[in-house]
Every structure is written in structure tokens, then in C-alpha cells.
């Protein structure tokens, strides 16, 4: 029997019956993870929020529904360093709530934001964790980061987060707890995603704080529905896993330097899932056709592409390995020498985007 999606929303709005953002603050961490975030192909258990029982109601974690807010998923769960009630107000307001859980620091998230070996305190953070067993070989989920640090403090207060995956066969690039791998990295790099690594610069001090990876940044200063002044585009995590094996996932978000300028992570509904690693391309509708196929001579064939676009190829750790312009009518692109494995291809055009998984033998 298909699992029902549990997303009953308590409306917290500005009084307009056509609110663009609603939040449900009445669900437990277990309900949020297992009934809202969980998608097909995974079994989740042992949900815990910051050392609290899974049946607790916490003011930093809830479900949300969003309509026509650029960058945000259309619905899912939200994890914040402040209070959920502060999120739904105009962007020219201010979200500043000290954390209620009384935890002073965490080594892994401190290292993500400030560098390994540092002892800088993290005064305000949220941790959501759980065990899961994937049915298939690729773990995926989608998210966006929003913050009050944007834009004025983008270069000075790197509010950030980590998605720490641990379990059999996992060996991270850095010495995180339990040898975990941090999946929250910029495409094509090992740099963690945070406010300082993705921003549009400080408009009052561009000389000292220029834009950084601004292709992933969205300004939100004029939004009447959500308080955060900026956010990232919708980003996707993808990681190879072993089917049938239990893993541990720790989703952690923190303020940097002070507890007053809040940030939040918005996770797309039902996006935490596992999918098969296939030698065939997943069909992605493009006027009824599949748009990309892999050849055996280190090339990809492009089908049905009528307008100019950019082709981006990433490995299953989210690291970008290729970015090329595609001209109208172009039929193929030669690939560099890449290791055998599964890659994610994204077509980024003026009118639309599309994704597919391809296997390079």
C-alpha cells in the first residue's frame, strides 16, 4: 500500500488567506522525517532531534508549504536555528531567536564553518538525525538554505550546515565524527555550503565582500512572505550507498559567531529516497522525448534540444566535472576521461531545466 504523505499544515500567516508560505509547528521529529521527508526506497527509524525524544514537539522543526517563492521547495520540512514562528513575516522584518536547547558547541559543524583544528564556539545550532536503510544504490534529497545573514554579513558570519553520512564503507574526506562524509558541498568542490560560500556580495561593501558562487544565490529582500533576506537555489544531494545496509544521517545547521541572525534549511517533501544505479538514462520528459544518452566513446548524445543551454555533469558526490555550452541543434558533447560510474547530467536553459542519470562505462 502506498505510504500516505502526512503534511497537515497549521497556517501561520500574515492574515492573508492566500498566504505564500505556511508552517505546521505541531508535528514530532519522527512524524516529520518518516511521513514528510521520507520518500520511496528507504526505511527510516530512530529519529532524534538534539538528544530529545522523537515524540517531542520542538520549536525549531516543522513542516511547510510554499507557493511561488523562488528557490524554495513546494513543501517539506524546515529546520531552523531560531523559532518557526519568526519565519513568516516580510523580509524587511528580522528573525532573531536564541536557541532553546542549551547546547553550546559541536566540533563537526564548527570545523565546517571555520576550518579544521579551530575551536570557535557555535552558540546556536539544530541537529536532526536518524538511521536509514536504502533499497537501491543511490541516495538523493533536495534542499535550500535561507538566512538573515544575507546580504550584509555574508562574508563575516558563515552560517552553515553539514549533512553527515556515516556507516559501512563511508570514509569522508575530513576527520568528522564516526568517519562521516559531509554531503553538503558546493558542486565540483569539497567546499561546504554556507552563507560565505554562496552569496551575492555585500551591496554596501562589494570591494571587500564580492559575490561568491552567485549562480546558486537568490535575493529575497522584497519578499512579503518569508523573513530571510536571501537563500540558495534548490540544491540536490546524491551519494552512492549499499542497498540493504543501515546508515546514519545527521542534518546539522548552525549560526556563526552569534545566536541572533537566524538561518533555516528547507528540505523538499518526499525527496529523501534511494534510486537504482542503472546503465540506462532515466527518461526525462522534453516534449515527449529523452534528451541525453551516453555513448561508448566518451561522448554523450543530445536529443531534442532546440535552444541554447548549458550542460553540467556532476559525480555522485555532487562534484562538478564538466560544464559546457550547448548550441541549438548540437547533437553531442565529447567528455573528458572520467572514471567509470554514475553521473548526474543537468541541462540548464533559459526556459527550462532537466536532469538525468547516466552511466559511463
Q: What is each stretch, according to the model?
A:
Residues 273-297, 304-305, 309:
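Residue-level detector of functionally pivotal "anchor" positions at catalytic/ligand-binding pockets or at interdomain
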Residues 236-238, 331-336:
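Exposed aromatic-hydrophobic patches
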Residues 1-25, 279-281, 355:
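Bacterial Sec-dependent N-terminal signal peptides
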Residues 162-164, 310-314:
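Beta-strand signatures of extracellular beta-sandwich domains
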Residues 301, 323, 328, 336, ...:
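C-terminal tail/sorting-segment detector
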Residues 20-278:
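Aromatic (Trp/Tyr/Phe) and Gly/Pro-enriched flexible surface segments
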Residues 244-246, 308, 338-342:
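Extracellular Ig-like/FN3 beta-sandwich strand-entry sites
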Residues 313-321, 343:
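Short, glycine-anchored, charge-dense loop/turn motifs used at functional sites
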Amino acid at each position: 500500500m502506498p505510504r500516505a504523505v502526512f503534511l497537515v499544515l497549521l497556517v501561520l500567516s500574515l492574515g492573508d488567506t492566500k498566504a505564500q508560505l505556511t508552517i505546521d509547528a505541531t508535528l514530532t521529529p519522527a512524524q516529520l522525517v518518516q511521513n514528510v521527508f521520507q520518500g520511496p526506497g528507504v526505511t527510516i527509524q530512530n529519529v532524534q532531534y538534539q538528544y530529545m525524544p522523537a515524540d517531542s514537539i520542538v520549536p525549531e522543526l516543522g513542516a511547510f508549504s510554499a507557493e511561488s517563492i523562488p528557490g524554495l521547495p513546494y513543501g517539506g520540512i524546515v529546520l531552523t536555528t531560531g523559532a518557526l514562528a519568526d519565519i513568516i513575516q516580510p523580509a524587511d522584518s528580522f528573525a532573531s531567536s536564541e536557541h532553546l536547547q542549551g547546547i553550546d558547541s559541536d566540533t563537526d559543524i564548527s570545523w565546517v564553518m571555520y576550518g579544521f583544528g579551530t575551536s570557535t564556539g557555535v552558540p546556536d545550532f539544530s541537529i536532526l538525525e536518524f538511521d536509514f536503510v536504502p533499497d537501491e544504490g543511490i541516495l538523493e534529497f533536495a534542499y535550500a538554505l535561507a538566512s538573515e545573514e544575507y546580504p550584509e554579513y555574508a562574508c563575516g558570519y558563515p552560517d552553515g550546515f553539514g549533512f553527515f553520512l556515516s556507516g559501512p564503507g563511508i570514509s569522508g574526506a575530513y576527520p568528522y565524527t564516526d568517519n562521516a562524509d559531509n554531503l553538503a558541498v558546493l558542486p565540483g568542490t569539497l567546499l561546504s555550503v554556507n552563507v560565505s560560500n554562496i552569496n551575492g556580495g555585500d551591496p554596501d561593501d562589494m570591494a571587500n565582500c564580492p559575490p561568491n558562487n552567485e549562480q546558486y544565490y537568490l535575493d529575497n529582500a522584497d519578499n512579503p512572505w518569508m523573513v530571510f533576506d536571501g537563500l540558495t537555489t534548490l540544491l540536490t544531494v546524491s551519494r552512492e550507498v549499499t542497498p540493504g545496509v543501515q546508515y546514519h544521517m545527521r542534518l546539522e545547521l548552525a549560526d556563526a559567531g552569534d545566536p541572533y541572525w537566524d538561518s533555516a534549511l528547507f528540505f523538499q517533501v518526499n525527496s529523501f529516497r534511494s534510486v537504482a544505479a542503472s546503465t540506462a538514462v532515466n527518461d526525462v520528459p522534453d516534449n515527449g522525448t529523452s534528451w541525453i544518452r551516453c555513448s561508448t566513446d566518451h561522448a554523450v548524445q543530445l536529443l531534442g534540444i532546440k535552444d541554447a543551454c548549458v550542460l553540467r555533469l556532476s559525480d555522485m558526490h555532487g562534484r562538478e566535472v564538466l560544464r559546457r555550452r550547448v548550441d541549438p541543434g548540437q547533437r553531442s558533447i565529447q567528455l573528458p576521461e572520467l572514471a567509470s560510474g554514475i553521473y548526474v547530467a543537468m541541462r540548464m536553459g533559459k526556459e527550462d531545466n532537466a536532469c538525468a542519470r547516466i552511466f559511463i562505462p
